[in-house]
Amino acid sequence: MRVVTTSPGEHDEIVAHISHLPHILASSLCGYLAGMDAKWKNLAGGGLRDTTRIAAGDPRLWKQILEQNREEVLKAIDGFEGELKALKGALLDKKTPELIAHLERGKQFRDSL
């Protein structure tokens, strides 16, 4: 366990990005997939389970967390929307180098954890 001293504002910004946003993404992905053909769940593998594990958190607790840090959570969502739009744009415009660069940057960050 690492202990880091931060200001309250910096704490809120950090946890909005590294805790709250991942939960929102996992929950949103599950909500999206819940609207698909139910038999798709039978085909789900470890990747989907790994990606969505945190969506199993208590919705009432997460409602409180998200509302308590609303301003920073909204900023994190806005930032992520930009990333998703960039990836979509590269795919849509068939910009292979940009798509690879986007995926490589994600891999490098993940590998650094």
Predicted regions and their residues:
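Interdomain hinge/lid region at the active-site interface
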Residues: 39-109
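Internal alpha-helical scaffold of NAD(P)-dependent oxidoreductase catalytic cores
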Residues: 1-54
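Amphipathic alpha-helical coiled-coil segments
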Residues: 112-113
